[in-house]
Amino acid sequence: MANCVVLDWQGQEAGKATLDLKVAKETTAVDLIHRAVVRQQAHSRQGTASTLTRSEVRGGGRKPYKQKGTGRARQGSIRTPLRPGGGIIFGPKPRSFSLGMNRKERRLALRTALMARINDLMIVQDFGTALKVPKTREIVEALSRFGIADDAKVLIILAQPSEIIIRSVRNIERVKVIGADQLNVFDLLNANSLVIGEKALSTIKEVYGDD
């Protein structure tokens, strides 16, 4: 079980929160998280690259030159892979890069990744609810009040990010905001600091706390 400090919008301590999630054994945690990240990255690949083989390239019905008498190596098609404009040998074709992983393993990897970042995590009460219109400066100043370095990558996890928050954050290259239902291993590990809304924390504990 880990104890976390709950901050208000001004960066002052507003209470305490606990996070107790089942994690993988130390001997298997690295391998489990690695497989989860590889799977997530593989699923983001489109797999639409496609080349033409010698049977698909336009042309190729005629013989480039006669079989004998030229002194050159014999060739039977102008679309052989040995000629410019010919087909591609073993080129890429549309395919799926998806990798399988058991649901229990995926959930365990996510819980393990989250608990591994517990020292870089802060809980914020009513994150951004005071904003009435999108203001990037307000988000930057708030992160500074929370003690986050200016050059740090920040992942903000909210129960349901409002349009105001999304528009306030989207112009900050180092900051990313996601919903609690979009929690994933790569983003958890890629960020230097995690900012979790109090309601999002409740959602995470409700969804992942029963395993």
UniProtKB/Swiss-Prot annotation:
Residues 41-54 have a biased composition (Polar residues). InterPro entries: Ribosomal_uL4, Ribosomal_uL4-like, Ribosomal_uL4_dom_sf. One of its GO terms (cellular component) is ribonucleoprotein complex. Signal peptide: none annotated. Residues 60-71 have a biased composition (Basic residues). NCBIfam families: rplD_bact (TIGR03953). PANTHER family: 50S RIBOSOMAL PROTEIN L4, LARGE RIBOSOMAL SUBUNIT PROTEIN UL4C. This is Large ribosomal subunit protein uL4. The gene is rplD.
